[in-house]
A protein has these predicted regions:
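Extracytoplasmic metal-acquisition and chelation regions
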Residues: 2-24, 30-339
Length: 339
């Protein structure tokens, strides 16, 4: 059985303004004095400009922006769609100019989108979930913010209550895994930080993270109800997603470490994973189509030959699909395993 979570779902989104009313020039004059004239239109003094590394964080920011009253907000995402691996994205000069001039920059951190935040002079305007480390592919060491000399918007190990169900856990880095947006708590914390920043700038805006919390806490509750299954991953895309479920990851450690480091697993590590798939102990393969190689194709073929269910979980949603809708599809695909 194959659960495809990559089908398109069209709706208008990102790079649009939440234009409820214009603020005074002084209230939102956050554009740097060194901004170039060519980008003045994109950074109007009465507009709060938010730049996100990917559409995931752009959708989180947009959901908060949609809750505001009396403030003009523009959200721009630099990476959209699922036709590329965001690990290797190279921003254009225009992308970086927009980020430098933005009032707020939203990233995941942990090295994943270091191509954006490592080049910014003003690190204090960055909202992030994992520490702002460089992407040196060394995931064996503990991450920290020392390279940047500050503790801007740190969310790691910040507890969040998930409501009546009592599902409360902390945002913690799992083996240096960068896919933090699949941690419901991390998403809610970033939304909270965005709302706080908007309200600091424009108190009358009444920005709220309520919509994000409502959507994501519901998904989190559904994840907690997943049944016991054994799985392996073509790449550790679902670590945060499944961390608080009864599902067990049987991916061999050598293969896992190599894929976390964005390296090629050794032949012995690949053989160990293939053997695991053939052992009869694996119920599902979690497959990341955006990091597909000849090796991962072989892994998928083996799983399908063994009658193992395949659930696709990508780095980013397809173009024109909202992250929350994509997240819902991913959870639905996992729930279908229990049907």
């Amino acid at each position: 059985m194959h659960f495809d979570t990559s089908r398109p779902f069209f709706r208008p989104r990102r790079a649009q303004r939440v234009a409820l009313a214009a603020m005074s020039v002084g209230a939102l004059a956050f554009v740097s004095a060194c901004s170039t004239a060519s980008s003045d239109e994109a950074a109007d003094s009465d507009t709060l400009n938010i730049v996100a590394s990917t559409s995931i964080w752009g959708d989180v920011a947009q959901a908060v922006a949609d809750s505001t009253d009396g403030v003009d907000i523009e959200v721009t995402s630099l990476v959209e769609g699922n036709n590329m691996d965001p690990h290797h994205f190279e921003p254009s000069a225009a992308d970086m100019a927009r980020a430098h001039e933005a009032d707020v920059v939203v990233v995941g951190g942990g090295g994943y989108d270091a191509w954006l935040y490592s080049a910014l002079d003003d690190q204090d305007k960055i909202i992030h979930s994992l520490p702002l480390t460089t992407h040196d592919h060394d995931h064996g060491d503990e991450h920290d913010d020392e390279a940047h000399g500050h503790e801007a918007h740190e969310h790691v190990a910040h507890a969040h209550d998930h409501g009546e169900e009592g599902h409360s856990h902390e945002v913690e880095s799992i083996d240096g895994n960068e896919h933090i947006w699949y941690d419901p708590t991390a998403v809610m914390e970033v939304a909270h930080e965005i709302a706080e920043h908007i309200n600091d700038v424009a108190p009358a805006a009444n920005a709220s993270d309520e919509e994000v919390v409502n959507q994501v806490s519901g998904l989190d509750s559904r994840l907690h109800e997943l049944g016991k299954k054994n799985y392996v991953q073509s790449e550790p895309i679902a670590d945060y997603l499944l961390a608080h479920t009864e599902m067990e990851d049987l991916t061999p450690e050598g293969y896992r470490h190599a894929s976390l480091s964005h390296g090629e697993p050794a032949a012995a590590d690949l053989a160990a994973l293939i053997d695991e798939l053939k052992s009869g102990n694996v119920d599902v393969l979690i497959y990341n189509p955006q990091t597909q190689t000849d090796m991962t194709t072989r892994i998928r073929t083996t799983a399908e030959d063994e009658g193992i269910d395949v659930v696709e979980i990508g780095e980013t949603p397809p173009d024109h699909q909202n992250f929350f809708e994509y997240f819902d599809e991913v959870v639905s695909s996992l729930e279908a395993l229990d049907a």
